[in-house]
Design a protein with these regions (language model features):
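Hydrophobic alpha-helical transmembrane segments and immediately flanking/interface helices
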Residues: 76-93, 204-213
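Membrane-embedded alpha-helical segments and adjacent helix-loop junctions characteristic
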Residues: 2-84
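Alpha-helical transmembrane segments and, especially, the helix-loop junctions at the ends
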Residues: 57-74, 88-128, 132, 137-151
Length: 214
């Protein structure tokens, strides 16, 4: 018998704004540029792919506010791990988990925006939320990455892997990253997006910076 509440228009508009900004960054080649940087980092340190992969996907989601951006780098993670004779499930598993953990720590994710709206009447600021979620998720991801380094047998000791390799079932194809036509625009789009994220944190943390309507 409770009367339905009004729809969360403010939260919906915030989510729409984030999606629009991320779409503009994608159209300008910003996401492709981020994937290029991630690929360069992973290929430069292939033996540390299990540790670096979750850090990369965490940062992707943290910056963009959605875990969907992490999909672009997963093929690179799998390829680097296979070339280094590391079980791909180790970096891939924790990388996907890290991207989802970052949703609760991203200042522009739908989850954080919704939580901020729910706690609006309890004198809780965006900074209050982030100072808990960011350290907690980073520590959890790093601990998970350390445990992932021992998941399953080494590929050299895995009879099923050796069997499939001998029979020619494992054909590792080179992942080709999309070329960036205008690097300047891509870099600029990423910088603008990150700068906007910083402003969001400031506006969400200090009441005096937000507009007040009568």
């Amino acid at each position: 018998g409770l009367q339905p509440t009004s729809p969360p228009i403010d939260v919906m508009l915030m989510i729409a704004a984030v999606i629009s900004a991320a779409s503009c960054m994608q159209a300008a080649g910003g996401l492709d540029y981020m994937v290029k940087l991630a690929e360069r980092l992973l290929r430069k340190n292939p033996s540390q792919v299990t540790i670096l992969s979750p850090i990369v996907t965490y940062l992707f989601t943290f910056v963009a506010g959605t875990g969907h951006v992490a999909y672009s780098v997963l093929p690179v993670i799998a390829e680097v791990a296979t070339e280094t004779k590391i079980r791909p499930e180790r970096p891939l598993g924790i990388a996907v988990i890290a991207s989802q953990q970052a949703i609760t720590a991203s200042p522009i994710s739908a989850a954080t925006v919704a939580l901020l709206g729910l706690l609006a009447g309890f004198d809780v600021t965006l900074f209050d939320i982030l100072k808990i979620t960011i350290p907690a998720t980073i520590i959890g991801v790093l601990v998970g990455a350390l445990f992932s380094m021992k998941v399953g047998k080494e590929l050299a000791d895995d009879p099923e892997y050796r069997k499939r390799l001998t029979e020619g079932y494992l054909d590792v194809k080179k992942v080709e990253i999309k070329d960036i036509h205008n690097k300047r625009h891509a870099v600029l789009s990423v910088l603008i997006f990150i700068l906007a994220t910083v402003f969001i944190v400031f506006f969400g943390s200090f009441d005096s910076l937000r507009p007040a309507f009568v």
